[in-house]
């Protein structure tokens, strides 16, 4: 597409139609077709970049319309030269009717001083808008659209009027709650905001399906919210209702209802979850469950208030000098005292060992940890090994070289009998 400046240099109109012949008139081809837009356009010889001009009167010019600039002495034919342009050249531009509304340019965008001298280019409304190709001899198709006359004020570029969103959005321009039409002030309706719109151009009021409106509830006002709270307090069903329920009596739970004026009192009651209200409005403590009742005594026993002021001291102390042993039970002290005695009555029966212990439990530990394992420095005894087939902890007798018991053999040595200690730590 050529630039606007080059196009404006080549645009021009021969005003004096007496000097134009039938072959010198610009062709009315596809590039110069009239506008196909349904919007009425001004019948000017410079209409919106289209070179299609209306029909000329028989005398060739209009009296009282000097096609000259108002601010200069140079006629406009000196600025716009169209006669030198080839008749079939379409300037590389698409037809104006095929352009979108945003791509179309006004004449004032590339013609200087057009807006201020627009009075000189407007034709009377009573002039016919069609060409008579028999009279003028112009190659113009007879099937040309006739545009109704329009006012000049409709052609000027007026700024788009500003309307609030409630006036342009049909969802906000009418009340969507049929049972409470007073929620929306009548001043915000579409008919009051745009009285200049005709009946055919107005938007249909029913733009929301009833299925979409049904589950929606109107946001309650402060007075409705207070009334619902009072009704909720005086309600006495068969089962107690928790006061922290976020729903109102009507079941409406909207964000605006939680932000209304009574939300402070409403949320304060929600923090009182373990409290019920009866019909008279008196608070009743919720009955604790049995499980909670069982846990309460154990928690009370662990509190510092229930503990005794003086902890019971250890009563049994070791009397040996230098020993700080303390015991809670007497049998524990007795067993401890054997460790301080010089007597070691419990002796190992394994040949070659003969270790003695003061306590029988220590001797049993010696059997289990020392003689029941292979590879140690102590002698292995198969009768003391739980994993061996010869396991017999009561066996006392001669052993083979590998630690197995000898068949029919008995131990004649005078050794202390194996004592099993019945004492253990508690």
Swiss-Prot record:
Q: Does the keyword field hold DNA damage?
A: no
State where composition is biased (Basic residues).
Answer: 288-297
Primary localization class, coarse: nucleus
Provide ranges: composition bias, Polar residues: 45-58
- List the molecular function annotations (GO) for this entry: DNA-binding transcription factor activity, RNA polymerase II-specific; RNA polymerase II cis-regulatory region sequence-specific DNA binding; zinc ion binding
Q: Which UniProt keywords apply?
A: Activator, Conidiation, DNA-binding, Metal-binding, Nucleus, Repeat, Sporulation, Transcription, Transcription regulation, Zinc, Zinc-finger
State the residue spans of region: Disordered: 25-71, 281-302, 384-426
Q: Which subcellular locations apply to this protein?
A: Nucleus
Task: Explain what the UniProt record notes about the effect of disrupting the gene for this protein.
Answer: Abolishes completely conidiation. Results in production of bristle-like structures instead of conidiophores and conidia and fails to produce ergot alkaloids. Reduces significantly expression of gliotoxin biosynthetic gene cluster including gliM, gliP, gliT, and gliZ. Impairs down-regulation of genes encoding ribosomal proteins under nitrogen-limiting, but not carbon-limiting, conditions. Abolishes the production of fumiquinazoline C.
Q: Do you know what upregulates this one? A: Expression increases dramatically during the synchronous asexual development. Expression is positively regulated by hsp90. Expression is controlled by upstream regulators fluG and flbA. Expression is controlled by the histone methyltransferase clrD. Expression is decreased by 2',4'-Dihydroxychalcone (2',4'-DHC).
Gene Ontology cellular-component terms for this entry are: nucleus
What top-level branch of life does the organism fall under?
A: Eukaryota
Zinc finger map (C2H2-type): 316-340, 346-371
Give GO terms for biological process.
conidium formation; regulation of transcription by RNA polymerase II; sporulation resulting in formation of a cellular spore
Q: Low complexity compositional bias: what residue ranges?
A: 30-44
Annotated function: BrlA, abaA and wetA are pivotal regulators of conidiophore development and conidium maturation. They act individually and together to regulate their own expression and that of numerous other sporulation-specific genes. Binds promoters of target genes at brlA response elements (BREs) containing the conserved sequence 5'-(C/A)(A/G)AGGG(G/A)-3'. Positively regulates expression of the gliotoxin biosynthetic gene cluster in actively growing vegetative cells, and likely bridges morphological and chemical development during the life-cycle. Regulates (directly or indirectly) the ergot cluster genes.
Name the record gives this protein: C2H2 type master regulator of conidiophore development brlA
């Amino acid at each position: 597409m050529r630039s606007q400046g080059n196009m404006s240099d080549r645009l021009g109109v021969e005003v004096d139609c007496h000097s134009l012949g039938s072959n010198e008139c610009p062709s009315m081809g596809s590039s110069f077709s009239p506008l196909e837009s349904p919007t009425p356009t001004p019948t000017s010889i410079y209409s919106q970049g289209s070179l299609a001009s209306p029909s000329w009167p028989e005398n060739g010019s209009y009296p009282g319309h000097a096609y000259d600039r108002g601010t200069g002495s140079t006629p406009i034919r000196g600025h716009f030269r169209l006669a030198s342009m080839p008749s079939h050249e379409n300037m590389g531009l698409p037809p104006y009717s095929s352009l979108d509304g945003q791509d179309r340019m006004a004449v004032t965008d590339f013609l200087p001083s057009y807006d201020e001298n627009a009075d000189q280019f407007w034709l009377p409304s009573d002039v016919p808008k069609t060409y008579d190709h028999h009279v003028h001899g112009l190659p113009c198709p007879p099937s040309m659209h006739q545009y109704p006359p329009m006012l000049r004020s409709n052609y000027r570029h007026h700024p788009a009027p500003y309307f609030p969103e409630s006036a342009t959005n049909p969802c906000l321009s009418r009340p969507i709650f049929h049972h409470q039409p007073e929620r929306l002030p009548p001043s915000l309706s579409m008919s009051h905001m745009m009285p200049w719109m005709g009946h055919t151009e107005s938007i249909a009021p029913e733009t929301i399906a009833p299925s979409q409106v049904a589950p929606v509830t109107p946001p309650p006002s402060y007075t409705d919210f207070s009334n619902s709270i009072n009704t909720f307090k005086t309600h006495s069903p068969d089962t107690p209702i928790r006061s922290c329920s976020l729903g109102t009596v009507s079941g409406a739970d909207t964000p605006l209802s939680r932000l209304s004026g009574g939300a402070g009192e409403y949320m304060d009651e929600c923090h009182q979850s373990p409290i019920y209200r009866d019909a008279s409005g008196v608070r009743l403590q919720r009955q604790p469950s049995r499980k909670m009742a069982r846990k309460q005594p154990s928690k009370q026993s662990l509190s510092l208030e229930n503990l005794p002021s003086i902890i019971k001291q250890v009563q049994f102390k070791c009397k040996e000098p230098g020993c700080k042993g303390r015991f809670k039970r007497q049998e524990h002290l007795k067993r401890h005292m054997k460790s301080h005695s010089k007597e070691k009555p419990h002796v190992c029966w394994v040949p070659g060992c003969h270790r003695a212990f003061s306590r029988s439990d220590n001797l049993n530990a010696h059997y289990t940890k020392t003689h029941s394992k292979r590879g140690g420095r102590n002698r292995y005894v198969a009768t003391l090994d739980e994993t061996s087939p010869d396991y017999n902890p009561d066996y006392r007798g001669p052993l083979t070289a590998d630690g197995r018991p000898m068949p029919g053999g008995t131990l004649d040595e005078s050794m202390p009998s194996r004592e099993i200690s019945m004492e253990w730590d508690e």
